Amino acid sequence: RKLIPMADLLDSLVMVPLALPGIVLAFGYVVTYTDTFLDPLENPIPLLIIAYGIRRLPFMVRSAAAGLQQTSVSLEEASATFGASRFHTLRKIIMPLVFANLVAGGLLCFAYAMLDVSDSLILAMKDRYYPITKAIYALFLEAGSGEFIASALGMIGMLILTACILGASLILGKKMGELFRSA
């Protein structure tokens, strides 16, 4: 909550993953981590988790920042007045008030990551590791009933995405519009 030096620069750096195309980042991961313990040719799951996390970091940061902005500073000051440590104030006052924002941000991050195409297409190279988007693509290319199965998986993905966004809206209520305002 305190203003730190170069806070605007830090905020801009957190938003960089939104500005870079996912396919560029995915190719960068492949080039960087091939022949290491995170080799996407062997097992892309750790690298997919890292890629999804980095690409969705701005949503989570904005969600947490919105929750902190909506929490009154006077609550922290009152806690300090009564002798509570910063950790106790964080654990007993701030976290319960910001928790809804964190859950909603997590739901949005999960929903967007679940249907991410660029990272999945590039990083998942073996069919046993395909995320849903790459599986949809692979099924769509199959002859016969592959298109129908791909369409069904796409509908399931859209239903899960809708449920996550509705869940985030229900958790945040009228605060949903505040989620992505500039910190």
Regions inferred by a protein language model and the residue ranges of each:
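Interhelical loop and adjacent transmembrane-helix boundary motif
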Residues: 114, 120-163, 167
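Membrane-embedded alpha-helices of multi-pass transport/permease systems
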Residues: 27, 47, 54-76, 114, ...
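Membrane-interfacial helix termini and adjacent extracytoplasmic/periplasmic loops
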Residues: 2-10, 23-55, 87, 123-128
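Hydrophobic core positions of alpha-helical segments in small-molecule transporters
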Residues: 13, 50, 90-95, 104, ...
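Helix-loop interface residues and adjacent transmembrane-helix termini in multi-pass membrane transporters
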Residues: 1-3, 42, 113-114, 144
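C-terminal transmembrane helix and the adjacent membrane-cytosol boundary/short C-terminal tail
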Residues: 4, 65-76, 80, 84-92, ...
